[in-house]
Amino acid sequence: MEKNWWKEAVAYQVYPRSFNDSNNDGIGDLPGMVEKLDYLKDLGIDVIWLSPMYKSPNDDNGYDISDYQDIMEEFGTMEDFNHLLSETHKRGMKLILDLVVNHTSDEHPWFIESRSSKDNPKRDWYIWADPKSDGSEPNNWESIFNGSTWEYDDTTKQYYFHLFSKKQPDLNWSNPDVREAVFKMMNWWFEKGIDGFRVDAITHIKKTFEAGDLPVPKGKQYAPAFDVDMNQPGIQDWLQEMKDKSLSHYDIMTVGEANGVNPDNAKEWVGEKEGKFNMIFQFEHLGLWSTGDSKFDVLSYKNVLNRWQKQLEGIGWNALFIENHDQPRRVSTWGDDTKYWFESATSHAVVYFLQQGTPFIYQGQEIGMTNYPFESIETFNDVAVKTEYQIVKSQGGDVNQLLDKYKMENRDNSRTPMQWTNEVNGGFTEGTPWFPVNPNYKTINVAQQSEDSDSVLNFYKRLIKLKKSDDIYTCLLYTSDAADDLLC
């Protein structure tokens, strides 16, 4: 396989709202990131993946973009971004952005035009359909955030499609004008000097609407639609166009969020020649825990890792991760965040880090941050939880049962503020944090672990050095000779 800079890198995901607050308004920001660049450099980071910082009304914490070429006011200005980019490069690190192009915000100018009338030139930039004869939704597909994928718009008497929240209408990728606008925007960022994109929800841009209504599982109002809205036939043509008109023109790092891709069809996604991205985030290993059994299935985990490593060997590259902004903390779900907290944090780190691929660390993972101790359903900020809460409440259901359902697996668990010190609010802010800091910040924080040579943080530093050593880095081949009941 070819040697590339991104194969030798260690990446770190920053969720800006929760990383570091420089002006004490309770919200992390871009200047706050600059303040912590030396920390990331000292940790051994080569690439920073910055979650969305674009202008957004924040229905889904920035994944609902209203302007791709402007900065969310809470995070700073474009001047602040330029300074962040410059300071990152000055330290020999690279910066990649989160690219969300399956959908926009309903406050994006494109959608405002699209919904204004059926005759608007941008009407076909989004997905519109007439109601059924009884006035109901065009089909019975379920949103990833619960409820219907369709929202009725009274102005034009049609429904628009939203795979995520109703404030995140899906772009119509079958329209070539949409694709051209997206590629033009991507190239604008590349010309500014960014080093790549992590492309959000990219397997969802192609839908098979011809499938119509789907079987509705017992106890549900709508039908899960992953089989018809994820990695559908024809998607590779659009991704090839993205590669031809944008990605292939720059020395960049590209990562596709590729839910629904399996090792058998991964070659067209990440193959050295025909692949559309350098690497992908696949979720098969994370899905093992969400089956409903909170126990960690070592054998199944091992088998999944084996399959991805073996089937991509010599063909494509793996993106290695166990946490991100959408996942709960692994020390709490796959391990024991009390008695065996240290062992849980470090053992899982070794297993995923030393496979062949580029490892990603999610902020706070390197100090063993844990799930938040939720005590009421009203505490949640996650739009998926809030949507189901409203549905259950409107139907007269037991909203208290949602707490047991979501307290371990909600997305807020990974979005609590970074724990820098044992001072008020964990050193994240001197103001009121946008979301409560985990109460265990007094014992789990960067400052304390920096002084302890045997801490989780210093374990990660040693692990990163090992990953980068001449004996083990890029050319590491994966083998697993352990007995079936052992992970390695």
Q: Model segments located where?
A:
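Acidic/aromatic-lined carbohydrate-recognition and catalytic surfaces
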Residues: 2-187, 191, 204-262, 418
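Short, polar loop/linker segments at the starts of domains and inter-domain junctions
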Residues: 20-34, 295-298, 335-341, 428-434
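Hydrophobic residues within beta-strands of alpha/beta enzymes
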Residues: 48, 197-199
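Conserved alpha/beta catalytic core and glycan-binding cleft of carbohydrate-active enzymes
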Residues: 106-140, 239, 243-417, 422
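Glycine-rich phosphate/pyrophosphate-binding loop
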Residues: 149-161, 165-173, 411, 416-466
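Active-site rim elements
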Residues: 169-179, 226-229, 330-343, 404-405, ...
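Conserved small/polar residues in nucleotide/adenosyl-binding loops
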Residues: 478-485
